[in-house]
Amino acid sequence: SVGFKAGVKDYKLTYYTPEYETKPTDILAAFRVTPQPGVPPEEAGAAVAAESSTGTWTTVWTDGLTSLDRYKGRCYHIEPVAGEESQFIAYVAYPLDLFEEGSVTNMFTSIVGNVFGFKALRALRLEDLRIPPAYTKTFQGPPHGIQVERDKLNKYGRPLLGCTIKPKLGLSAKNYGRAVYECLRGGLDFTKDDENVNSQPFMRWRDRFLFCAEAIFKSQAETGEIKGHYLNATAGTCEEMMKRAIFARELGVPIVMHDYLTGGFTANTSLAQYCRDNGLLLHIHRAMHAVIDRQKNHGMHFRVLAKALRMSGGDHIHAGTVVGKLEGEREITLGFVDLLRDDFVEKDRSRGIYFTQDWVSLPGVLPVASGGIHVWHMPALTEIFGDDSVLQFGGGTLGHPWGNAPGAVANRVALEACVQARNEGRDLAREGNEIIRAASKWSPELAAACEVWKEIKFEFPAMDTL
C-alpha cells in the first residue's frame, strides 16, 4: 500500500493553527477574506495560508521530502469584520525562510501572487503586513531618508513645497523648462515631472533634463536656496531607466523620480540603490495604486504598498491629501503616513494599523500631499502632515491668474504664515482661514490666489473607511 493518501483534503487540517504563537521573525499578514457561500471561515483562512506558502490542492508525495512544519504559512487567528456580513480578517504567519532576502518582488509574489484568484473566495484583500526586523535588515530602504534630505537641501522646520508642471503632456522642452524656472524662482523647493511624462515625441527626455537643469541652476543663483525638479527616469526598460538616472547625476541635479508600481519593484530597488550610491534623492509616484487599493473588499490596502516602498527605496512618496480631489480618509491616511516616517508604530486598529511595526534604523520616507489642493488648504495640510512632508500644488500654483512665479509666491507666503502661526501656538484647524486672510493683506500674490480658489471644493464621501 502507498505511504500517503492522495485526493483533495481540507486545508484547515494542516494550515489552521489557532494555538500557534507567532515568532518575532515571522512575516505576519492580515487578510480581509470574503468566502464563497458555504465555505467556513477557518477553511477560507487556511486556504489563503496554504496557497500563499507551501500548499497545493492535493497531497503530493514530495511533501514527504520537506518539513511542512518548518515552512508552511499558518492561519493563526480569525475574526469577523464588524458591520460586514460574511467578511473575516484572517491573520497568517509566514516563516521568514519562505522569502528571498532584499526582494520586495519575491515577497509579493509569495504573499499575493496566486491566492487572489482562488475559487473558494469571493474576494480577498491584504490589509496589512508586519515586516520583522530580521527581514527589513536585508533591504537598503530609502536612498537617503528625511534627515539626510533636509541636510542636503538645508531646509528645516517646515514642510517642503512642490508643484507638478501642467499641462502634463504637450509642452516642448524649452517651454517646460521655463515653467519650472518660474515656479522655483517664486519660492517653491521642487517642481515635478508628471508621472506620465517619460520620453514622448513632443519632448524627449534628454532635452527635458537639460532645460530643467538650466532652470534649477538659474533659480538657485537668484534665490540663494537649493532647488530641485523631479526628473522622471521611468522608462520602458531598466537599462533605459538607469541611463536617464546616470544623465541626471552627470548634470548635477539633486533628485530624480520613478513610478514604482508601473515601473515595478525590481526596477525601483535597482534605481534606489543607484541613487544612494550617487547622492541622488528619489521621488516616488504611485501611479496605478488605485487599481490595486481602491476596492474595499479586494486587492491590497495602500499601507501595504507604502511599507513595500519603504523597503524597496524612495525618499518621497505620494500619500493622498485628506483634503483635496483624491481619496484619503484622515485617520487611515495618517496611519500609513506614520508607517512611512516613523521608526516604530504601535498597532492601532482605529487607524487601520493591524500590527506593531518596528523599522529599526530603516530611513523614513517623506509623504507627499498632492491633488486638488490650493492656498486655502494650507493650514489644514500643515496641521495634518506636520513638518516632515512635501505639499504639492500643481493647478494650485500654475492656475494663479498672474502666472507661475506669483502662484509660487502665494503658496510660499501661505506656508510660512501657517508655520509661524503654529509655532506661536495658534490653532490652525480653527483659525486657518483667518491666518491666510491676514497674510494676504501684505501679499498681493496670495490675495489674488485666495480670490480665485475661495469657492472650490471636492466633496465626495471617502471609499476608504475602516
From Swiss-Prot:
SUPFAM superfamilies found in the cross-reference section: RuBisCo, C-terminal domain, RuBisCO, large subunit, small (N-terminal) domain
Highest rank taxon of the organism: Eukaryota
Residue numbers binding substrate: 114, 164, 168, 286, 318, 370
Pfam families given in the database record: RuBisCO_large, RuBisCO_large_N
Positions carrying N6-carboxylysine: 192
Free-text comment on the cofactor: Binds 1 Mg(2+) ion per subunit.
A GO cellular component entry from the record: chloroplast
EC identifiers of the protein: 4.1.1.39
Catalytic function, reaction form: 2 (2R)-3-phosphoglycerate + 2 H(+) = D-ribulose 1,5-bisphosphate + CO2 + H2O; D-ribulose 1,5-bisphosphate + O2 = 2-phosphoglycolate + (2R)-3-phosphoglycerate + 2 H(+)
Molecular-function GO terms, alphabetical: magnesium ion binding; monooxygenase activity; ribulose-bisphosphate carboxylase activity
Annotated residues for binding of Mg(2+): 192, 194-195
Cellular localisation: Plastid, Chloroplast
Enzyme class of the recorded protein, top EC level: lyase
Assembly: Heterohexadecamer of 8 large chains and 8 small chains; disulfide-linked. The disulfide link is formed within the large subunit homodimers.
Any further remark recorded for this protein: The basic functional RuBisCO is composed of a large chain homodimer in a 'head-to-tail' conformation. In form I RuBisCO this homodimer is arranged in a barrel-like tetramer with the small subunits forming a tetrameric 'cap' on each end of the 'barrel'.
Protein family per UniProt: Belongs to the RuBisCO large chain family. Type I subfamily.
Function: RuBisCO catalyzes two reactions: the carboxylation of D-ribulose 1,5-bisphosphate, the primary event in carbon dioxide fixation, as well as the oxidative fragmentation of the pentose substrate in the photorespiration process. Both reactions occur simultaneously and in competition at the same active site.
Name used for this protein in its record: Ribulose bisphosphate carboxylase large chain
Species the sequence originates in: Vitis aestivalis (Grape)
